[in-house]
Amino acid sequence: GNPNLPGHVLLTGRVTGDKWAVSDGEVHGGARSIGAGGLPPALQAQVVNDLSRPVANLDSPLAGNQPRWLEELAAYNRGFASRHRQVAELEARSRTFDTAYRMQTAAPEAFDLTREVADPATRSLYGLDPQETRSTGTKLLLARRLVERGVRFILVPSVSVPGGRGDWDTHTPAQVREALPKLALACDQPLAGLLTDLKRRGLLDQTLVVWGGEMGRGGPGHMNHNGNAFCWWLAGGGVKPGFAYGATDEQGFAAVKDPVHVRDLHATILWLCGLDHRQLEHNGVGFDSTCRVAHGMIA
């Protein structure tokens, strides 16, 4: 990874016109969606909801005195740590300060899309001109820049699209008819552009792209939450292209052929990232959440 940039970035907000509209700061799922889970707190997500200010307070008011102030703070923290046990959160906060200092020079360049969006070919590839694809395309273009610069994990939520109801939380036929075509349009070209761009830059083989949601639809009219049948797609990162695994019944209510448990999916993603799920264990609140496999690897 790049020590001058965060290892985990969440790109939220929406692009309207030529500006990155600031979201309200809320992330679906709350802190669990951006936290580090069982990993050190320093690995939680850096939330970017305003491209003009990707990192809050990035400009230092201390100017030339900043290195001295940071060293004094580090010395104080080391002294505190030497007198107290179990100071993982303090260590994580200290590393966060160090990263923030280094980001003052690296982040402005990484998040600057000026030259990218001036290229007509890039604008066409990511769909930056049509209103329907501009928001997703801009964030995926930024995600590609972060991949190039060594950011290890980037999350791009599929947010609502302009014009009426436009999110994935559809529970009536009317909502599906209104939202689904817009959402598909917003995602299709930008995602294809991202994969094309990563491949031609030689980055796709070492970058795993995952697209999916948290559930399918079932019940009367296919309008209810359904955790028994839904699909994800993976590309790059060693995934075999053109490979499909599993199938649902004719109604899409249940997986009936080669069903994949979510733990299988997690294990597969970890394996593609070079991690052995059997070596990972997190003792959470009264339970052992080791990533176990029910049916083995799927890719």
Task: List where the protein language model places each region.
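Ligand-binding pockets and gating/stacking loops
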Residues: G1-A299
